[in-house]
Structures are given as C-alpha cells and as structure tokens.
C-alpha cells in the first residue's frame, strides 16, 4: 500500500473515531438531560420539518406540546402498551420472543416485513435517529435503548414516547393529537379515543384518526380488548406508570 493511501486511510479512521466520540457524547448527554427535562423536539420531527421545507411546503409545522404523565389520561398509556408492547413493564428494552417471531415471519413473507420494536426502542429511534432501515441504524438504536433503559424509569420512557410519537401529518405527541382530533386535553381522553390514537401508530401517515378505515376500527376494537385483558386502568397503577 502506498504512503498516500496509508495517509488517507489514517485520516478516515481518525475522522470516524472522532465522529463516534462526538455522537456518543451528544447522545449520552441527551439521555442524561431528557431524563428530567421536557423534550423540545425529536429527530423525527426535525426530519419531517426539513423534508417539508425542501419540498417547498413552508406551511408545515411539526408541532408538539409537552405534558407530564399526570396530564395524560391513564387510558392513553395503557392503549399504547396494549397496542405496541405488552411486556413493556417486564423487559429491559428488548422483547426477545417477539424478535424471534418477527424473524421467522419475515423469512416466510419477504414482502410483508414485521417489526418487533418495543416502546423503549421506538423512543430511542424517534428521539435520536433518522428514519429508515439499516443494520447501522439498528445497532445504534440498540445502544441507545440500553442507555435509556439504564438511566430512565419505565414511567419516564413512556412519558417521552407519548410526547414525541407521531399521530398524523405534523401532529406529534398525545397532547397535540388530543387537541387536533378530539378538541380536548390529553388528560380527558376516553378509553375509546385512546385506543383509536394507538391504532394508527404503526403508520400514522397512512392511517388516519380523523377518517379511520375499517382496518383502523378493527385494530381499535382489538386494542380495547387487550386493554381489558391487561387489567384496565389499575394496570398503570400496579406498574407505577401513571
């Protein structure tokens, strides 16, 4: 290998190491800061906003109103747990059984990919990472998930998740969603309304709270049944999530 190539390789290696250190400090600081401070915006919100501007849509505003857990209806927390991650209170960030099932499903159905992300993983991804699928992003997501599971309580993870989750085009967080779709604060959401909001979470840009399809209504009904099976509102108190 020539001297010039060695010099370039050495420069690239040092640059990548420096970048990794900077990102580690940035993400570590973010995890520490947001363990107590409200989250002003997420990586997904920034990505959506920049994308809108690049496409000439200057009226788009990625909007979120931070609220604490005691300002959110217990039904809302229960609904997203029932819909997205029923073992949330038990696992350490990853649901191994669900991952194994998803891998087996994806091997059989290459055109219908199924995910197995927990609420903790989704929080890490939405807060700190870009959208998309890649092994690099999944690796970073795993590290960030371990970080927030180590530093944050389960209640804090759920609080952040509910405040940065996307519920529609430009609608981020449960408070903005409650005001937009039901004209009420998140604290007043009913069991049925909470289940409807949770029903669109797999793809809030495709599934609409304002005009729910038959599939969304079916998923809402399923979520309501799962909420009942989990034990209803007392579930949140029993696991110190309210």
From Swiss-Prot:
<keyword id="KW-0472">Membrane</keyword>
<dbReference type="GO" id="GO:0008955">
    <property type="term" value="F:peptidoglycan glycosyltransferase activity"/>
</dbReference>
<dbReference type="GO" id="GO:0009252">
    <property type="term" value="P:peptidoglycan biosynthetic process"/>
</dbReference>
<feature type="transmembrane region" description="Helical">
    <location>
        <begin position="15"/>
        <end position="35"/>
    </location>
</feature>
<dbReference type="GO" id="GO:0008360">
    <property type="term" value="P:regulation of cell shape"/>
</dbReference>
<dbReference type="InterPro" id="IPR001264">
    <property type="entry name" value="Glyco_trans_51"/>
</dbReference>
<dbReference type="GO" id="GO:0009274">
    <property type="term" value="C:peptidoglycan-based cell wall"/>
</dbReference>
<dbReference type="InterPro" id="IPR011812">
    <property type="entry name" value="Pep_trsgly"/>
</dbReference>
<keyword id="KW-0812">Transmembrane</keyword>
<keyword id="KW-0961">Cell wall biogenesis/degradation</keyword>
<keyword id="KW-0997">Cell inner membrane</keyword>
<comment type="pathway">
    <text>Cell wall biogenesis; peptidoglycan biosynthesis.</text>
</comment>
<dbReference type="InterPro" id="IPR036950">
    <property type="entry name" value="PBP_transglycosylase"/>
</dbReference>
<dbReference type="GO" id="GO:0005886">
    <property type="term" value="C:plasma membrane"/>
</dbReference>
<keyword id="KW-1003">Cell membrane</keyword>
<comment type="similarity">
    <text>Belongs to the glycosyltransferase 51 family.</text>
</comment>
<keyword id="KW-0573">Peptidoglycan synthesis</keyword>
<comment type="function">
    <text>Peptidoglycan polymerase that catalyzes glycan chain elongation from lipid-linked precursors.</text>
</comment>
<dbReference type="GO" id="GO:0071555">
    <property type="term" value="P:cell wall organization"/>
</dbReference>
<keyword id="KW-0328">Glycosyltransferase</keyword>
<keyword id="KW-0808">Transferase</keyword>
<dbReference type="GO" id="GO:0016763">
    <property type="term" value="F:pentosyltransferase activity"/>
</dbReference>
<dbReference type="InterPro" id="IPR023346">
    <property type="entry name" value="Lysozyme-like_dom_sf"/>
</dbReference>
<protein>
    <recommendedName>
        <fullName>Biosynthetic peptidoglycan transglycosylase</fullName>
        <ecNumber>2.4.99.28</ecNumber>
    </recommendedName>
</protein>
<keyword id="KW-0133">Cell shape</keyword>
<keyword id="KW-1133">Transmembrane helix</keyword>
<dbReference type="Pfam" id="PF00912">
    <property type="entry name" value="Transgly"/>
</dbReference>
